């Protein structure tokens, strides 16, 4: 029995690794749409079509529950997929939810009016598509008032990480943090709104300074998934565990192995 985890590339492996540590008894089927990565520079409709195709593939492989471990896909496709209707017995969840829960300190099912929260100035680092969608600001506004969000589109970071060029990735992160701080000099919290970015979390933290609380998604998503499966144990599905890619399996396997520093072997989707 496996839970599906989908990402446009390798960033979702940070979510997968946290979920495996939190839920060692659960099997996971990871699906990377490497042939079409990165999603962050694509149009919303393109992202939706690609995401929907991948999620349906995972459902057909027996993964009744699919996690969109990609903020760009969550921002552009999740709500539309849910509005179009999800097949009976199937679920698709996004990675925005745990971030909003952590920042506002309220559960997703809490539909009470928005209220003030402790954090007032929030820096959001995300892909150009996620920033353009304003999905994070929209969901936050449903739950909190008086929060100023300054978003920074981090062009190039995902490409550098996917290519294994961490020196370039670090330089880009520091450049984007500098650009953000010119707009918001003193953020209280920072959201790493892309599942690739936890690999660069120490760099973000160093560039932002020790007084800024950095919210990263891996452990937050893993905790929320554990809670969800406890409430819905039948959603583990009948799928088999493994790693699938729409790209070249050997190339993706090599990059994933470098990414997580342990052997990862992908098969063709």
UniProtKB/Swiss-Prot annotation:
Belongs to the aspartate/glutamate racemases family. Pathway: Cell wall biogenesis; peptidoglycan biosynthesis. Substrate binds at residues 7-8, 39-40, 71-72, 195-196. It catalyses: L-glutamate = D-glutamate. It holds the Pfam family Asp_Glu_race. It is an enzyme of class 5 (isomerase). Keywords: Cell shape, Cell wall biogenesis/degradation, Isomerase, Peptidoglycan synthesis. The keyword Methyltransferase does not apply. InterPro entries: Asp/Glu/hydantoin_racemase, Asp/Glu_race, Asp/Glu_racemase_AS_1, Glu_race. The lineage of its organism: Bacteria, Pseudomonadati, Pseudomonadota, Alphaproteobacteria, Rhodobacterales. This is Glutamate racemase. GO terms for molecular function: glutamate racemase activity. The active site is at 70 (proton donor/acceptor), 194 (proton donor/acceptor). It comes from Ruegeria pomeroyi (strain ATCC 700808 / DSM 15171 / DSS-3). GO terms for biological process: cell wall organization; peptidoglycan biosynthetic process; regulation of cell shape. Provides the (R)-glutamate required for cell wall biosynthesis. Its EC number is 5.1.1.3. PROSITE patterns: ASP_GLU_RACEMASE_1. It comes from the Bacteria. HAMAP family: Glu_racemase. The gene is murI.
